[in-house]
Amino acid sequence: MKRSRWSHSGSSTARLLLIGVLFASCSTAILGAQRPPINSAGGHELRGTTFMPALECYDPYGRPQKCLPEFINAAYQLQIESTNTCGEQNDNHFCIQTMNQNHKNCEFCKYNDHNPSFLTDLHDPQSPTWWQSETMFEGIQHPNYVNLTLHLGKSYDITYVRILFRSPRPESFTIYKRTSESGPWIPYQFYSATCRDTYSLPDSRAIRKGEGEAHALCTSEYSDISPLRDGEIAFSTLEGRPSGINFERSGELQEWVTATDIRITLDRLNTFGDELFGDSQVLKSYFYAISDIAVGARCKCNGHASKCVPSTGMHGERTLVCECRHNTDGPDCDRCLPLYNDLKWKRSTSTEVNECKACNCNGLADKCFFDANLFNRTGHGGHCLDCRENRDGPNCERCKENFYMRDDGYCVNCACDPVGSRSLQCNSHGKCQCKPGVTGDKCDRCDNNYYQFGPHGCQQCGCDSGGSHQNTPACDTETGICFCKENVEGRRCNECKPGFFNLDKNNRFGCTPCFCYGHTSECMTAPGYSIVSVTSNFNKFKERWTAADLNQREVDIKYNQYSRSIGTTAQGNEHVYFQAPDRFLGDQRASYNRDLKFKLQLVGQVANTGVSDVILEGAGSRISLPIFAQGNGIPDQGVKEYTFRLHEHHDYQWQPSQSARGFLSILSNLTAIKIRATYSVQGEAILDDVELQTAHRGAAGHPATWIEQCTCPEGYLGQFCESCAPGYRHSPARGGPFMPCIPCDCHGHADICDSETGRCICQHNTHGDNCDQCAKGFYGNALGGTPNDCKRCPCPNDGACLQINEDTVICTECPKGYFGSRCEQCSDGFFGDPTGLLGEVQTCKSCDCNGNVDPNAVGNCNRTTGECLKCIHNTAGEHCDQCLSGHFGDPLALPHGRCDRCSCYEAGTEQDEQSITRCDQVTGQCQCKPNVIGRDCGECQPGYFNIRSGNGCENCLCDPVGSYNSTCDRYSGQCHCRPGVMGQRCDQCENYFYGFSSEGCKPCECDESGSKGFQCDQNGQCPCNDNVEGRRCDRCKENKYDRHRGCIDCPDCYNLVQDAADLHRAKLFNLSQTLDEIARTPVTNDDEFEAKLKAVQEKVAVLAQDARDNSGDGGQTYAEVIDDLHKHLDSVREHLVSADKFQADANGEIDRARQNYTILDQITENAKKELQQALDLLNDEGAQALARAKEKSVEFGQQSEQISDISREARALADKLESEAQFDLKNAKDAKDAVEKAHQLAKSAIDLQLKIGTELRSEVGLELSHVKQSLGTVVQTSKEALRKANEVYDTALTLLNDVNRQTQPEIDISQLKKDAVAANERADELLKQITELSNSNGELFADFETEQELTEALLKRAEQQQLEDIELLERAKAAHDKATKAVEQGDNTLKEANNTYEKLAGFQSDVQRSSESAEKALQTVPNIEKEIQNAESLISQAEEALDGANKNANEAKKNAQEAQLKYAEQASKDAELIRRKANETKVAARNLREEADQLNHRVKLTEMDIFKLEESSTKDDNLVDDAKRKVGQAKADTQEAQKQIEKANADLTAIKDELENLKDINTGDLDRLENRLATVEGEINRVNLTGRIEKYREQRTIQKNLIDKYDAELRELKDEVQNIGLISKALPDSCFSRNRLEP
């Protein structure tokens, strides 16, 4: 409710309060209406704030009482129409009116500043808004006026209209009302300081008693110009009207307060009079401005409703209507409900509720009207309208005229025929009074056997009862022609139709058809036949009855002598039949239209009947019917009698249907009567008292009049015309009695013929059934009819012949191998000279082609010589006994030759003149060209190549020194070169290599800084820079240093060292010469030396004696000690050899590690390719998946399915991006691990150098043990990784299956299944692609892990760091698994989709956040790739460091060996050099470790991004779970509704069927069915199917809008992915700057 201010108009407020108290005491319809509105924004659903609560229509005890809707501000937030608003056309300049006329504050007004919407908005004095008109400057002044129109949209009881002005109050204005939307405007109140002059009304504030109170007053009370702002006017609709105190009894005032529209007309502005001077600024200060309009009112409901509710009208507009009670109706409750007009409608008052009373229509009408006359007579004014069930009267208490009431109370139309009835009114039983000859309850037809319905009644027909339908005489009511039986005709139905005989009253069809085997239609009753029956009572035995199944497998029959019946039992589930004996079979035409009877009883089985329970077979036909046909019952454990009429009529249900002739044909030669015995598995049945009604000639009994005596035409004989007369025969022959008889035709060569076969007894050398051919060996025209028609044939062996014309006769039965008109030639496939034209006569013999010709072909061999001409199966030769050229095999194999094409390599095989490759016809060995080998000549000899030349193979000419062997590539001739060797023949060193030998060429390895170039000479000497020396130019000359600066001179202080070194070299040279001299002359002449030597000998002797003395007590002798020392020395040597072996193994491991890092480069490149493939897959498959979801949405409109598709697509996109990020992180981790391992490898090499000597043996042994331990760890880790990969795959497969199993609440179930199949097929394709991608990556990672195992032996110290990284990635993987698990749980718990709009709105924003997270994950891809490149650079550096370490290790080994040979001093120098180089390597390794730490930090940052992505995914899953629960609920609701509807349909069908099958109609049955119908109707209404469908359609529209938004978001994601793809393509494929560590 708009907040109002009342303080500026205390008098009007006090008046409203006073009136409110007065009306409250009188309980008027506007109770409390005058209380000022409070500060509130609440209220009605559409508008207003409740000032006073509603009064309910029923008290706590359920008794009706007057009720009122809540009292509200009816104008709140309604749009007001204004005919003038400032700024509407252009911005208006206006000035604010103040008491200071010398200074005015002027502003510009724009339309949006003060438009009419501010008249009814929330009024806040702290932030006022108002409507404002244009100024007097624009012409706003009398006579021009401004209208403000408020459309309330419904009639209200108006209490007051309050107007709060922002400008001074007008000098004159008017309030109008309208009581209907199309009604006239009625003045409500005039305000003017000049009432008489302006409105021609006196200035008055009240109406005197006795005057009309429903007219407007004019008052000058509120026309003063003061106050200049916030002046208020409050108009009360009942103020000053005397009858207001009795409002409930004043219809005039009740109409007065009613309004649907309010209009305020502003006629004249209040001014100070200064506008007369025309000052523009003064004119712009006068305008209308209103800050608030409030209308205090109640929804008009005439005291019969407590609230108004929004309703949708016929044209779709939303309006308020009263929620009527007291059995009232209408928007204002201004009338009674259609069936509640027993009292006249009245407005409810505080003393009289005036509740509408129901009319008494006995439940037979839905509406009535108030009949004042009826009310005056009876006290009840309800007169029923449109009575149902043909009722009439004020209370539908009697039947209409010409209707009668049945016993059940229903009125039925008499419907008496006006022609045949004496009166249109019937009696109480509905029977009309008929004229003579007329019958029927309605007198609408002639009676049986009467016709010519007319005003005088009907005439008698005189029909024969025996020939009339159902033996009841009746005729056509117009023509008088009787209704005859099927085979009867005549006006009186006293004649058989042509082709029928024996008019019989007991014959349903009247007459019996003439059978006569179809030769005539004239017959009569044959005399001498009597009615008999063929029976089987089984009094003594089985009477030759048998039993068999449908496959004629016999089944035993048991005879029960006590019950005198037969029985049989099935062994399984086969159908067993009783079969009648011969006396029931044969010619049984006399049983036509008679009965077959028997008794059947089942034992312990329930009958599962079929369509062939009783079978008749005969004349090659078979007919059958079910056991329950012709009104018979289903067999059970009781004895039942069965009767079947043998007639073709469709009512008797014999199938297939037959004509009368067809049925009689079966009976004329009845071959089997079968009665089904078993109707279940191992069923048992009993048969008794079988009877077949028939007739026999000469038997005692009643005459059988249905047996025919045929009148045969010429050529036929017999009672039934079944035989041919002499000179006639059946055609065709042996056709039986059904075939016609024709005269015998023997062409003059015989006089008689067989009547059945028609065969003539021929003479005159003729034969044939009709003597129409010459006998064998004779020729001529046997049809001539003379004895000399046939002559003997001129053929060998009296063979048959054929006459072509008068002069030509051809033999037709030549011996095998002969042909020709006289059998004078050999046939095709034979050879010889039967006439001796070429010499001696030769008989015709079969050609011998060894089965290698087509027996169906013509001309396989020469008919004279027997040479085979058309060999097949790749054979050739005179008798097809050889293989064709270019083929080999066995041409004489059985059943035909087997010659296969030579499989020769064309370029390596010799060819014949026809360019056909040749091979041995037995072995298939091809004829090879020079230096070519192989069965197909497809290979060169070892040491040869270029087989494609077509000239044989060329010699490789591989250099025996530079190649591994004499072989080369079979096509290019490239020999297999040793390391460092190149050239096609491996005969020269590669660039930067030297020393061509059997071991290959060695690398020059020229130092970069010390060499002039990298190419060395043949001795390996590199070209050194000045002051540089060494083979590799890798050291400065003496007294020079700093090779990188060009080996500059050492400081001067080193000159002393140089001098000392030269002095020592001189001394060493002299010492060397002295030693050489001693070696040349070993004799010495030194007495002193001799003396010392003697003294030493004496000491030795003493020591020897001491040794002997010391060993005398059983201890070890020195000799034994020496032996032990020798053994220990041998052991040391063995350990040393083992150490050498271990060191060699370590060197091998180092070499393999270097190879592994090369492989790592390849792995990195592969990883980049896989990343690009993943991006391409996202672009293609992601777009396709969304397109499919949109197509399904448009086609089916099922919001729940589209939500699931959208969420799955979004999740799949996020998962795929996250998977790619995980994959890149894995590559980065692998690269980091490789760097760490390289660092540890270099350090291990350094440690290995420091421990050369006595610690070498133990160090290598320890390293090897670490290798074994690490190998076990790697194997276990690989198995664990494989297990987890399988678990991930199984989880993905399970998720896919769960998605395929989800269903949505869709009405078109069949179409949904089709879509599901299509979706499953597409899902299978995607799964296959994912699996292939996973497999390719699995092989890539498996290769990397395999190579990693080889380097684990020397990387022990990296294990701890590796474990930390693994733990880090495991946490990321666990987060991903957690998100995947959440998705699975969401898919499995999909349950509800009602009221999902709010959730989906949040879902959209979450999907957006998820997309942003996915973008962040994609943005990390370039960083990851950069880290991979950095890792590659570090790997390269580590590889170079390993090369140096390897070389150092080799040098260390060599130095150790030299130490063993007593070169200790040189070894010490070398060791010192090694330590210095190792320190340099250590510094480089430390730098690598720092870079690896940085890489580890980046990995952790990436892990944080993954954690954020997990949180976003979890939020998404929660929202999806909620939406899916709603989908499940919608599905359950839909299924429940469907069940209820199906149940209702079933109930309706049952009610309908019961009504149709209701034989005797009674009130109880109808009431019961009516109750059931009402129950079904209530169930259908409770389902509220229409409301649910409408709700789903609205949600479908909402979901479609969401899908459009998601489509736009996906397009943005695709653009981002494309940008990332471009960035990825721009990255270099490898790192080209690889710094080498200082050796």
Curated annotation (Swiss-Prot):
Keywords: Basement membrane, Cell adhesion, Coiled coil, Disulfide bond, Extracellular matrix, Glycoprotein, Laminin EGF-like domain, Repeat, Secreted, Signal. Transmembrane segments: none annotated. Residues 299-358, 359-413, 414-460, 461-513, 514-523, 710-743, 744-792, 793-846, 847-901, 902-955, 956-1003, 1004-1049 form the Laminin EGF-like domain. Residues 533-709 form the Laminin IV type A domain. One of its GO terms (cellular component) is extracellular region. Residues 63-298 form the Laminin N-terminal domain. Residues 1087-1109, 1144-1247, 1306-1627 form a coiled coil. Disulfide bonds join 299-308, 301-322, 324-333, 336-356, 359-368, 361-384, 387-396, 399-411, 414-426, 416-432, 434-443, 446-458, 461-475, 463-482, 484-493, 496-511, 712-721, 724-741, 744-753, 746-760, 762-771, 774-790, 793-801, 795-811, 814-823, 826-844, 847-861, 849-868, 871-880, 883-899, 902-919, 904-926, 928-937, 940-953, 956-968, 958-975, 977-986, 989-1001, 1004-1016, 1006-1022, 1024-1033, 1036-1047. It is found in: Secreted, Extracellular space, Extracellular matrix, Basement membrane. Its main location: secreted. Glycans are attached at residues 147, 376, 669, 862, 965, 1070, 1156, 1394, 1479, 1584. It comes from Drosophila melanogaster. Laminin is a complex glycoprotein, consisting of three different polypeptide chains (alpha, beta, gamma), which are bound to each other by disulfide bonds into a cross-shaped molecule comprising one long and three short arms with globules at each end. The gene is LanB2. One of its GO terms (biological process) is salivary gland morphogenesis. The alpha-helical domains I and II are thought to interact with other laminin chains to form a coiled coil structure. Domains VI and IV are globular. Residues 1-33 form the signal peptide. Binding to cells via a high affinity receptor, laminin is thought to mediate the attachment, migration and organization of cells into tissues during embryonic development by interacting with other extracellular matrix components. It comes from the Eukaryota. This is Laminin subunit gamma-1. Residues 1050-1609 are annotated as: Domain II and I.
